[in-house]
Amino acid sequence: MVDSHLAEFRGTVIDSLAQGKGAIPKIKNLSARRITLNLPSPVVLGQYVIRSRGFAVVTVELADGSKGQSFGLDRGTPVADTVNTLIAEPYKEIFDGDPINTFDAILRRMSAPLSSGASLRGLSLVDLATHDAVARHKGTTVVESFGKKDKEHPMWAVVGYPPSRGPEDIAWEVKAAVAAGAVGVKLPVGANPKLTRERLEAALATGLCPVSTDLAWSCRTAKEAYDVVKGLDLAWVEDPFIPGSIAELVELRRLLDVPLSSGDDETHLYHPQAFIETGALDMLRIDATCQGGLSRMVLLNEYMANSKLAISWHVYDAIHSQIASIIDSPTFSIEYSAPGASVDPLAEMILDRRQSGHTHDGKGFRLAVPDLPDLSDALAGPPRWVSYK
């Protein structure tokens, strides 16, 4: 039996998208480019060393000139090339004014190449940019184009970057993030398990807000992960293992007395079903920029809502705050990072520019993606916490 609220959601979404669907212009241009931002200091997450952050920026232009954009980390994969060579032409051909129908149709036509990796990242960004363009054509935000209203979501700050910082360098940033309006903070794994724990203890010792941790795929076994965090009163523990370690997640969840979450950057169409159907997690980590865009979130809405699992959204706050306002699953956290932190340096640059008066036009995803050269520098640290609002 379908929940009455979910039935109402389905009706609202279908009605809103169908209204004027035939009047949505065809896509004139669809393209992507890669932007690389060199980091001021390397980010070391266990064995994962990041010296630059590569982004794919997708632009969709409708025949009337309405333009939508999206961006996301490409993790060193050829996302922009995949959009330009594999996705752009069939997507333009299929597009019927409804991004959700188009997403479903292109997946059914080309599921083999589009179901994972760089191509799914590319399709996800194309989907988001198309929703942005359609909303701008309508003169609305993306939320409004779905017949919905913006909700207030808990804003969490990602602190403690670069992870080489010691525990003595944590308390000030927790205080700054809370002063800027964050309701909680999340710290990445430190240089070694001992420092990871000491950094968490330093954040908890402030007593200012809940604290969570991203173990960033640094552990091999449930016991190893448990030993890092045991006894700490954390809001949640996140991403302890590389993707594929479902059995270890189930075992770690059994050991922990705090919530377990996982799923960052898992770019395949078995996410989040693999977690939900194995009972591996207490909370989902979702990233629409690599897991199917807004359209897949809408198509999975009833399934995810019925799972009763809350969602912690992975960075890209401007995009995810609107998606979280559209779907029915409860949002536990929307996260953002400070200019100069090098967590999501393009989003940090957008936030920094906004503080300097470079604002968006209030339409679509309310993003003003800067026109950067192919190679540029990320903002230098230390992190400068400013009010998200």
PLM regions with names:
Residues 144-256:
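Metal-dependent enolase-superfamily TIM-barrel catalytic cores that perform enediolate-based chemistry
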Residues 19-25, 29, 135-136, 140-152, ...:
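N-terminal amphipathic alpha-helix/helix-capping segment at the start of soluble metabolic enzymes
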Residues 227, 244-362:
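Shared catalytic-loop signature of beta/alpha-barrel
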Residues 5, 10, 340-389:
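C-terminal extensions of enzymes
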Residues 70, 155-158, 183-187, 211-215, ...:
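Hydrophobic faces of well-ordered beta-strands that scaffold small-molecule active sites
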Residues 24-29, 61-137:
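Metal- or metallocofactor-binding catalytic centers and their adjacent structured scaffolds
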Residues 9-11, 15-69, 73-75, 344-345:
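Structured beta-strand/loop patches that form or line metal/cofactor-binding pockets in enzymes
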Residues 27, 65, 126, 139, ...:
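Conserved, mostly hydrophobic/aromatic
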